[in-house]
């Protein structure tokens, strides 16, 4: 499997004001999609700013195993020569996606539209995650699961459709991964493939499909939903992609700068896609001093420079419809809530229960062991902010990179140091996290 057997415990201590300018790594969602769409396009796709964490590198290896030419040409610079829609070759060995649900599920969609057989696998964490919700619509399109572990989990062997059928599919939960898998499979189908979602999820796949030359039409559906229609069998053309900085990774230095008094930190080229900025909206509602400037865009994705300063935060209520735009950020938002004055209620977090760990329970445990009063009520997380955090706890990360980073951020402003049992998994999304935070003034040891 992708990860080493060595644990890497670390302690975060009360730090002086953080300061400096940083660019967090490229967005993980865009990085996976650039590699996969580059592999399905004809001609060369040049990618700059690619996130070179383990998850994305596993997707790069998988695309290579499926017949695309994928090469690293420089620092975070990659070239992909694609095989065209439905042009994948059968891989010689199982495709190992390590810890990455996104890479695995999107690749399943892409493979479902090619007449090949491929086996998908991953680490212990990914093997425990649900895959039926992805496979069900792909089977409606003509793909077949010929073998899988209990409950449709990995390792899973998928036989792609020789003649894929376009479908209209209502997603059972707001999930960009389900939507993307159906759209990627729909590339090979004649006619129009439509996905209807009751709550709008991340639209990176739709934007990038258009960047590569596909026809995608998005219409509103109900109060919060969307209807996305893809015209099948396009000729995708290789296109340059500049990967903006990942807002889910920017969340950690952003919250650290807000809770460490006197901090003044600038983060550059952060993606500001409105379906990913729920955390920034929420932190501003809490009183966070966050200034935005230098906005621009690439491959359909907007980005901006942010200046974040130490702030007095207050508790707020976060509505459930905001969850899809910040599902990965609730862990570090809970840390901000612990340092705020007053109660913060985060509603509708059921999707956190099927992430890399049960993130709802793990977040509550991380706060409790450090002296914070927290309650889970159904799918709601309630944090009683006291303006400071006692700290002094050892946090179990459950092989989850975001729990590890959230706990380390908490330790930078807690009264006593916060210890994390293992930071090895941080490499899945943010290999440079510890040194980058240390350059801004964070005290780790």
From Swiss-Prot:
One of its GO terms (molecular function) is 3-phosphoshikimate 1-carboxyvinyltransferase activity. Keywords: Amino-acid biosynthesis, Aromatic amino acid biosynthesis, Cytoplasm, Transferase. 3-phosphoshikimate binds at residues 28-29, 33, 175, 177, 328, 355. The keyword Transferase applies. Pfam families: EPSP_synthase. GO terms for cellular component: cytoplasm. It catalyses: 3-phosphoshikimate + phosphoenolpyruvate = 5-O-(1-carboxyvinyl)-3-phosphoshikimate + phosphate. CDD domains: EPSP_synthase. It is an enzyme of class 2 (transferase). Pathway: Metabolic intermediate biosynthesis; chorismate biosynthesis; chorismate from D-erythrose 4-phosphate and phosphoenolpyruvate: step 6/7. Its EC number is 2.5.1.19. Belongs to the EPSP synthase family. PANTHER family: AROM/DEHYDROQUINATE SYNTHASE, PENTAFUNCTIONAL AROM POLYPEPTIDE. Catalyzes the transfer of the enolpyruvyl moiety of phosphoenolpyruvate (PEP) to the 5-hydroxyl of shikimate-3-phosphate (S3P) to produce enolpyruvyl shikimate-3-phosphate and inorganic phosphate. This is 3-phosphoshikimate 1-carboxyvinyltransferase.
């Amino acid at each position: 499997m992708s990860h080493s057997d060595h644990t890497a415990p670390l302690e975060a201590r009360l730090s002086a004001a953080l300061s400096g300018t940083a660019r967090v790594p490229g967005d993980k969602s865009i990085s996976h999609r650039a590699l996969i769409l580059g592999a399905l396009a004809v001609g060369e796709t040049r990618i700059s700013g690619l996130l070179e964490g383990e998850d994305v590198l596993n997707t790069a290896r998988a695309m290579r195993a499926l017949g695309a030419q994928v090469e690293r040409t420089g620092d975070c610079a990659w070239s992909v020569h694609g095989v065209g829609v439905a042009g994948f070759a059968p891989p010689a060995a199982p495709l190992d996606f390590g810890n990455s649900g996104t890479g695995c599920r999107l690749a399943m969609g892409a493979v479902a539209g090619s007449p090949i057989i491929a086996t998908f696998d991953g680490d212990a964490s990914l093997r425990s995650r649900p895959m039926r919700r992805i496979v069900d619509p792909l089977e409606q399109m003509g793909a077949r699961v010929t073998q899988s572990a209990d409950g449709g989990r990995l390792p899973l062997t998928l036989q792609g459709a020789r003649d894929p059928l376009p479908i209209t599919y209502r997603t059972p939960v707001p999930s960009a991964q389900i939507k993307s898998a159906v759209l990627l499979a729909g590339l090979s189908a004649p006619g129009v493939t439509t996905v209807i979602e009751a709550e709008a999820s991340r639209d990176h796949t739709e934007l990038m499909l258009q960047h590569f030359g596909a026809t995608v039409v998005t219409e509103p559906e109900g109060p919060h939903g969307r209807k996305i229609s893809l015209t099948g069998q396009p000729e995708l053309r290789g296109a340059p992609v500049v990967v903006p900085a990942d807002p889910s990774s920017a969340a950690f230095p952003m919250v650290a700068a807000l809770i460490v008094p006197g901090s003044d930190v600038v983060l550059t080229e952060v993606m500001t896609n409105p379906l990913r900025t729920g955390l920034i909206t929420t932190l501003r509602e809490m009183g966070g001093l966050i200034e935005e400037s230098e906005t621009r865009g690439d491959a359909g994705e907007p980005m901006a420079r942010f200046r974040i300063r130490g702030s007095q935060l207050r508790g707020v209520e976060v509505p459930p419809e905001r969850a899809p735009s910040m599902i990965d950020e609730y862990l570090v938002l809970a840390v901000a809530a612990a340092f705020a004055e007053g109660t913060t209620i985060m509603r509708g977090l059921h999707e956190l229960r099927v992430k890399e760990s049960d993130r709802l329970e793990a977040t509550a445990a991380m706060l409790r062991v450090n002296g914070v009063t927290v309650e889970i009520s159904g799918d709601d997380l309630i944090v009683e902010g006291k303006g400071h955090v006692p700290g002094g706890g050892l946090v179990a990360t459950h092989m989850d990179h975001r729990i590890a980073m959230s706990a380390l951020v908490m330790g930078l402003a807690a009264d006593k140091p916060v210890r994390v049992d293992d930071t090895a998994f941080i490499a899945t999304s943010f290999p440079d996290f510890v040194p980058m935070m240390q350059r801004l003034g964070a005290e780790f040891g």
